Structure formats: structure tokens, C-alpha cells
Amino acid sequence: MNADQVEKIKVETFHEAKRLASIPTNTETAQYSLPFSVAAAVVRGTIGVSEVTSEGLNDPQIITLAKSVGIVEDDALNAAFPARRFARTQFHLKDGRILTSDATEAQGDPEAKLSDQMIWDKFHTLTAPVMGSDWSNQFLSTARTIADAPSVMPLFGMMNIVPVRKGKK
């Protein structure tokens, strides 16, 4: 499925999540906008820095799809909250098909923890464009072995480095 195939999206979730149904105008509100997050994930396949900053906030395909996202409360999902934070999604496609997900929790929630590798990958994705790939890789290498190191000072020393220009390795 790709974004061009989607007519509308329905998200069934708990009350508190339904309250996050705005179309964002800045990074802070983008991070908490359920329609925007769903649309960005469908359009771009991810929700990263570029999706929640001006590039994503001004993407007409994301905005149009976000406006087609309907959020509805589900009694069973309300009952599970706050211990669990579920959502179920229906993608209504232009060809008439409806694709429905199971009730799932967001990746990174306590019940759907990120693996160490996913955390390292996210760190690298966020730091390499600012600090450079070499710095990011060296920092990760140092961090992975810090529990056995005699001191954390090498890691702290790396935190005092001035960022390189964007895109520099």
C-alpha cells in the first residue's frame, strides 16, 4: 500500500489519544498529532526529524492525508488505558478495499520496547547529519562498552565536540 492508494484512514483508540487529533503548525504539535503522525508514516514510511520539522509540516501530501484521518474512541481500548495504550487502524483504499490492523501499541512504549539495535540506529540517524558519521559511530562504539570501562570520561569528552557542518563525514 502507498499513500496514493489511500482514500481515508480511521484510527480507533482511547479517549486521551483521540484528543491529539489536530493538524500541527509546529514541531511540538506535530510530535503529538495522531493524524499527522499516521499520515507521515504512510507517506514517508517513517516519522523522523524531517517529518516533524518544516519539510514535513509543509508537505502537501502529508497534510492532505492527515486531514482524511478520523479518530474514534473504542470502549475496549478505553478500558485498557492507562495500563496499555492501544490503537487499531483501518485504511480505506480508493479501490474499495479496507485494510485493518490488529490493536497494537506504539513502538517504544514499555510493552513494545525498542531493541538495543533500534536505539543505536535511531541515535545514528539523529546524530550523523549533525556530528558526522565518524563521530556517531565512535560514540556508539564507546557507549556500547562503557559498562566495562574504568571511566566514563572518554564518553563525556566526546560530548564536548563542536558539531560539524550538516552532511560532513
Show which residues each predicted segment covers.
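Terminal-appendage/accessory-domain detector
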Residues: 1-169
